């Protein structure tokens, strides 16, 4: 936007550039960081955005408080003339922000945030739009080409950062309207027998809930979710949260856990998640192979349904 020419290094494949790395010709360097193994503590940003803080990577961190402590250390890396843009909806956000040397700017759906969203709406294909409010004053209307309240929050954080950098609002409108997401983030894959197939990388309960909530704004009769949990550690530690998040949709199909870097020593399984969902009255199934899952959905999914394949996924998926 606004003829900026940043260098980019992000985790997902950006559809706009067909990759996750871009070498620009300006002083702007935009990097997507991760807290796993405290890798983000090796960065020294001038402007940083914290979107959320959740219990994750519990094979490395002891608990949520341990994760929050790392985010506090990350925030402390910002210099006095730096800016931290942070989601106001993070619980006890002051624990992260109080006493920092840098300036703190908040965003969220509550009007008390420095940058907030009002009158959120969704069009016939689920794409979001909202009024951007800054310190109680309307900056303008923002229309996105992606769906879900989580993307409204993502956009707000980008708007705050762009405003701090002096980028005009009209350029933000153009840039965010042209942004069509990344691969494996509510990615439309096509149709089969009249039902729509969406693929999503969500493998944490918070991400799952956000994706399934976004699906409710997408045209559909019923939503089917195929979920493959990622790592035994995460599945064991967040078992109840997975059940709660998955219970928000119409039908759930569980594939075997993708072990990734781990071995099965914790006695947790996808079948247990399916049984827990059934006890909550949910329509849930565990199927032991992707071949059986394919047969099942081709038999059950109807015209007008939406099928979401979800998870970090294994090689054979």
How should these model regions be labeled?
Residues 4-16:
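Short beta-strand-centered segment that lines the nucleotide-binding/catalytic pocket of NTP-utilizing
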Residues 45-197, 220, 271-275, 282:
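Acidic, Mg2+-coordinating active-site environments of NTP-dependent enzymes
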Residues 22-25:
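Conserved motor-coupling elements within RecA-like helicase/translocase cores
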Residues 82, 250, 305:
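Glycine-centered, small-residue-biased loops immediately flanking beta-strands
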Residues 8, 48, 86, 106, ...:
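Structural beta-sheet core signal
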Residues 27-36, 197-203:
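Switch II (G3) loop of P-loop NTPases
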Residues 182, 206, 212-280, 289:
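Active-site beta-alpha connecting loops in nucleotide-dependent enzymes
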Residues 316-317:
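Conserved small/polar residues in nucleotide/adenosyl-binding loops
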């Amino acid at each position: 936007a606004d003829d900026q020419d940043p260098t980019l290094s992000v985790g997902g494949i950006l559809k706009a550039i067909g990759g996750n790395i871009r070498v620009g010709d300006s002083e702007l360097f935009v990097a997507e960081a991760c807290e796993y193994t405290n890798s983000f503590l090796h960065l020294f940003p001038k402007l940083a955005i914290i979107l959320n803080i959740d219990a994750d990577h519990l094979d490395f961190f002891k608990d949520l408080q341990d994760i929050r402590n790392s985010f506090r250390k990350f925030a402390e890396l910002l210099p006095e003339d730096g800016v931290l843009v942070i989601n106001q909806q993070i619980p006890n956000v002051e624990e992260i922000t109080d006493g920092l040397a840098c300036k703190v700017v908040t965003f969220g759906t509550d009007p008390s945030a420095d940058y907030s969203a009002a009158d959120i709406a969704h069009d016939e294909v689920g794409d979001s739009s909202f009024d951007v409010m800054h310190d109680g004053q309307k900056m303008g209307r923002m229309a996105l080409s992606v769906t879900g309240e989580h993307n409204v929050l993502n956009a707000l954080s980008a708007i705050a950062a762009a405003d701090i950098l002096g980028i005009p609002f009209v350029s933000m409108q153009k840039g965010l309207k042209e942004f069509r997401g990344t691969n494996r983030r509510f990615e439309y894959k096509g149709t089969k027998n009249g039902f729509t197939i969406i693929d999503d990388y969500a493998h944490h309960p918070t991400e799952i809930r956000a994706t399934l909530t976004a699906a409710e704004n997408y045209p559909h009769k019923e939503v089917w979710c195929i979920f493959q949990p990622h790592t035994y550690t995460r599945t064991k530690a967040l078992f109840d949260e997975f059940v709660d998040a998955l219970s928000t949709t119409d039908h759930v199909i569980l594939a075997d856990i993708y072990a990734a870097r781990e071995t099965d020593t914790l006695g947790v399984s996808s079948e247990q998640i399916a049984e827990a969902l059934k006890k909550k009255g949910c329509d849930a199934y565990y199927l032991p192979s992707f071949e059986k899952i394919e047969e099942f959905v081709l038999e059950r999914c109807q015209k007008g349904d939406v099928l979401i394949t979800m998870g970090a996924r294994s090689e054979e998926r």
